[in-house]
Design a protein with these regions (language model features):
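Soluble metallo-hydrolase cores and metallopeptidase-like ectodomains found primarily
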Residues: 103-111, 116-122, 170-253, 269, ...
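Noncatalytic luminal/extracellular "stalk/propeptide" segments of secretory-pathway proteins
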Residues: 37-137, 141-142, 146
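Loop/turn elements at helix/coil->beta-strand transitions in domains of secreted/extracellular proteins
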Residues: 26, 133-137, 161-165, 229-233, ...
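Catalytic-core environment of secreted peptidases
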Residues: 20-36, 41, 52-60, 64, ...
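Acidic, glycine-rich active-site loops and adjacent beta-strand->loop/helix elements
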Residues: 143-144, 171-173, 239-241, 284-291, ...
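Extracytoplasmic/secreted cell-surface and envelope-processing proteins
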Residues: 76-78, 146-153, 174-179, 243-247, ...
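Bacterial Sec-dependent N-terminal signal peptides
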Residues: 1-22
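Metal-dependent peptidase/peptidase-like ectodomains
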Residues: 276, 285-343
Length: 343
């Protein structure tokens, strides 16, 4: 444990020299660039980034670099993404975003606004079954739906309700996820900003999705040999991100998580020049924003036996300057927590 705590201290307090910091920033800039289209699965962005990461590990002096392939199912949005409300065009990622499980949808639809002050689920169902609103898009505050989960769940089924989809206003900054993108559901959900019109008449959409079945991606595993090989330390970070929302919009993911990926490459470069006591492994996971698929696959198919790992550091979203840094330990690692607080 003494050696473990010394390693934690070294990792947490090491001062990067100017050359290391410049290299770190260069990696973040590279992985956030348009050539990787948000490191998602449309246009093979994640795999292009993974190939670059593998080359970079080799370039900085890693003794071994391995690509560990696995497959996943994932929904993507690389095509048309046009939304207009009463003729006014909305900008993807700015005025609206989608749920990751959305199907494609094309057409012009009436808007049905839920009466949240006098909410009556049965009346809502009756309205949506009427000739006036049959096939409409339903507009409601997202948090309101949480209070009436069962009532709104029915709107997601074509069998139970004829609405074309849902438009949810949200007070929070608009978010785009991948965690539930392994399936495509029956109806689309759009998230829009709170300033979405309160009395618009129609919404015209042309949204294309592309579902990738058994898409092959890979983890990148680099090893820097130490003096001892009976156990090891592991640094991990995921390199995939959210990818594209239409043809022109992509999420660069500098913070989440080019920052963590750049850190483990920088650490690999350090240990390649300064031979450690134990073997060091640096794992860049893919499929992480898509429900932890890369790390799950590694646990099931470890390159090095999990029992030989003395300690694992996972670096995620480390590029902000928030004075409150968040660190999470499992029960086994709690002995190091007091030292972390002290640092």
């Amino acid at each position: 444990m003494k050696k473990l705590l010394l390693l934690i201290l070294a990792v947490m307090t090491v001062q990067l020299n100017a050359q290391d910091l410049a290299h770190y920033k260069k990696i973040v800039k590279e992985l956030s660039s348009a050539k990787y289209q948000g490191r998602g699965y449309a246009e093979d962005g994640a795999n292009k980034a993974g190939k670059w990461i593998a080359k970079e590990f080799a370039k900085v002096g890693a003794d071994e670099v391995t690509c560990q392939p696995f497959k996943l199912n994932i929904n993507t949005f690389p095509g048309k993404m046009d939304v207009r409300v009463d003729g006014k065009k909305l900008t993807p990622g700015v005025d609206f975003t989608l749920r990751e499980f959305n199907p494609g949808l094309k057409g012009e639809f009436k808007l049905y606004y839920v009466d949240m002050e006098n909410f009556d689920a049965e009346k809502m169902y009756a309205d949506l079954a009427s000739p006036e609103y049959q096939g409409a898009m339903v507009v409601c505050d997202f948090m309101f739906t949480y209070k009436h989960t069962e009532a709104f769940r029915k709107l997601a089924s074509k069998k139970d309700c004829s609405n074309a989809g849902m438009v949810y206003t949200w007070e929070e900054p608009l978010k785009f996820y991948k965690a539930y993108g392994e399936v495509v559901r029956e109806k689309p959900i759009l998230w829009v900003k709170p300033d979405f019109p309160k009395n618009a008449k129609t919404i015209k959409v042309n949204m294309e999705n592309k579902f990738l079945q058994d898409y092959e991606c890979f983890n990148v595993i680099a090893k820097v040999e130490g003096n001892r090989h009976d156990s090891c330390y592991v640094f991990t970070a995921h390199y995939d991100h959210l990818g594209k929302l239409g043809k022109k919009t992509f999420y660069p993911g500098a913070h989440d998580n080019a920052s963590g990926t750049a850190a483990i490459i920088t650490f690999a470069a350090h240990y390649a020049k300064n031979k450690p006591e134990f073997d060091m492994y640096f794992i860049a996971f893919s499929g992480e924003d898509a429900n932890l698929r890369g790390s799950d696959w590694y646990v099931e198919h470890p390159i090095v036996p999990l029992s030989q790992i003395k300690f694992l550091f996972n670096l995620d979203m480390i590029a902000d300057n928030n004075p409150k840094q968040y660190c999470e330990f499992n029960d086994v690692a709690m002995e190091g927590y007091a030292l972390f607080e002290k640092i």
